[in-house]
Amino acid sequence: MIKIADIKESLAGKTIAIDDVVTTYSNRESSHKAAWTYMLASQLTSIGLNAKVLTKQDNVHDFDVWMVALPMEFEGSYNLFGGANDEPAARIKRLLDYSGDVYCLNREMPNVGGFVESRLKSCSDNWKALDINRLGNICETIKTVDTSTDSTTFILGDSHSVSVFMPGANISRNDGKTLFGVMKEGMETYIPKGTEHLITYFGNIDIRHHLCRQSNPLESVKALVADYFKHLKALNINRIEVVKLLPIEFEGRRIPKTGWHKDAPFAGTQVERTQLMEVFNSEVDRLAEEYGFGVISWPSDWYDTHPELFAKKYMEKPGSVHLSREFYKYNFITNKENLSLKKTINSLF
């Protein structure tokens, strides 16, 4: 693995494409899956590089350098919703034809040739025509680039953490991680040495799946936040900011099975979880003042918005537990604070 700082000079003045070899990225701001890739582009542009996330309309051959961004949910293999047909075959062929430098962002480049071979039993003719051995050889030569910098600002959180990413900062996104779980492991195991400004964003998952299962949910949430602040204080970091939790969306919202726990999309009613969220956020405000920490809040009108409208307006489409990129704290294209957060919608009608 090489650090982005080690190759920054060689990339200066070059156009950089950020794209996967097999799958595509959407330019829709409501796409949470694409948001991580746009954040990677933000990391590169914030250090002066000319990087762009490609969509279906772009041609990677128009760019000097290709930075491969694997899908956010990638776990060693690709999901081909339409099968091994001509469309993904054409995308993979781009790697065979590409003449510029290729890197893989933050993760080891998978063997695309091996993946192609695994789908030969049911595929199109163009898929069969792909040079498996050459693909494998190319992938072996692709180096991994670590996009982290020497920034002293560090963001630690679950899958929601990308929504508070600050251009120029480093980030550790831990999908499915609860506040209870990260404290049990110890946040210090995640935080790099030299961190002077820590932003933490945990708790949405605890509210969604776990706290309503406790014998006394209200006391449990208060105890959880109290432990949270004691844990943060023990880290002895100069500046700490805690992100408040999002409003609780309506119960009819479709949640992908990846967001379920114990065969359920949530535990507790919308009203019960809203009460816990409000207590959590209230305790964050109270303890932040006591401990001298900062608080990162969401627009107050969101909490007065009808739960169904909140989901339809502010969350990822068509359904998930995440905020739409349109309402992240920063705009990843401009690297400036997001003015969309000033918009207000309060009524379902």
Labelled PLM ranges:
Residues 23-30, 74-82, 172-181, 205-226, ...:
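Surface-exposed cleft-lining segments at the edges of enzyme active sites
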Residues 67-80, 188-222, 246-255:
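Oxyanion-hole/transition-state-stabilizing segment in secreted/luminal serine hydrolases
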Residues 252-299, 320-330:
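Substrate-gating cap/lid alpha-helix
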Residues 103-114, 201-206, 233-273, 300-305:
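Active-site segments of SGNH/GDSL-like serine hydrolases
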Residues 3-11, 57-61, 92-94, 144-151, ...:
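Short amphipathic alpha-helices and their capping/turn segments at secondary-structure boundaries
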Residues 17-18, 24-48, 110-197:
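Serine-esterase "nucleophile elbow" of acetyl-processing enzymes
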Residues 128-141, 275-277, 285-286, 292, ...:
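Histidine-centered active-site loop/cap adjacent to the catalytic His
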Residues 6, 17, 40-43, 47-48, ...:
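Extended catalytic core of nucleotide-activated donor transferases of GT-like folds
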